[in-house]
């Protein structure tokens, strides 16, 4: 951090605030403590008559691969509002009846993903600027090797379990020695494909 976002001073230094346990950027001019924060991502597994909405990414990372609609929560938005907006932006779709599906904490990226299951109001879809294509697929038609992110695979598997939305799955995603991602789930670690 070069400048204080509060006063504009270039007198920002790393130090430990009184009573804190970590180093923070602190403005020497106005005293503002700048805390690093997690980014919140919201999205949904949206379905219509048992078929799942997938979006083909038009942007990096993972351009050309498939994902569920999701994105960063904007200031002043609830998690549900962000999931609804992202689905509309990426797939031209309207969703209702959002139910909490899963929460994924990714500390290595400073991100927390909150995913919902939701109902599509109609099967009419239109790819937005961040999508090359959008489609509805049955669970049997999912090409697991074409999915963009490990948490997308995990969320889809969780959606397909008999408990569905009944419990919140908090998984830790760990980088493996070969560059792949391992998912720690209920005490077990399973290997995911490399990204």
Labelled PLM ranges:
Residues 22, 37-41, 47, 61-63, ...:
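Short connector loops at helix/strand junctions that flank enzyme active sites
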Residues 73-158, 162, 166-169, 181-195:
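Unchanged
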Residues 29, 57, 70, 118, ...:
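Active-site donor-binding loop signature of nucleotide-sugar glycosyltransferases
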Residues 1-44:
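Acidic, metal-coordinating catalytic segment for phosphate/diphosphate chemistry
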Residues 170-171, 176-178:
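Polybasic "coupling" helices that flank or enter modular domains
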Residues 5, 13, 28, 53, ...:
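Nucleotide phosphate-binding site architecture
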Residues 3-6, 24, 45, 54, ...:
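Conserved hydrophobic/aromatic beta-strand scaffold that supports enzyme active sites
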Residues 47-89:
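Conserved Nudix-box catalytic region and its N-terminal flanking loop in Nudix hydrolases
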């Amino acid at each position: 951090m070069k400048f204080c976002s509060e006063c504009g001073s270039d007198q920002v230094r790393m130090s430990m605030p009184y009573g804190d346990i970590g180093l923070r950027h602190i403005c020497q001019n106005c005293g503002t403590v700048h805390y690093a924060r997690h980014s919140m991502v919201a999205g949904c597994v949206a379905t219509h008559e048992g078929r799942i909405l997938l979006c083909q990414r038009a942007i990096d990372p993972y351009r050309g691969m498939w994902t569920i609609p999701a994105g960063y929560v904007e200031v002043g938005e609830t998690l549900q509002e962000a999931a609804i907006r992202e689905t509309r932006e990426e797939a031209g779709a309207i969703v209702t009846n959002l139910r909490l599906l899963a929460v994924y904490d990714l500390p290595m990226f400073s991100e927390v993903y909150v995913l919902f299951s939701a109902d599509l109001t109609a099967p009419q879809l239109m790819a937005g600027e961040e999508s090359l294509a959008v489609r509805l697929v049955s669970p049997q038609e999912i090409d697991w090797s074409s999915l963009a992110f490990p948490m997308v695979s995990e969320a889809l598997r969780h959606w397909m379990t008999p408990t569905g939305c009944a419990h919140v799955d908090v998984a830790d995603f760990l980088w493996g020695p070969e560059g792949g991602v391992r998912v720690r789930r209920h005490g077990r670690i399973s290997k995911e494909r490399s990204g």
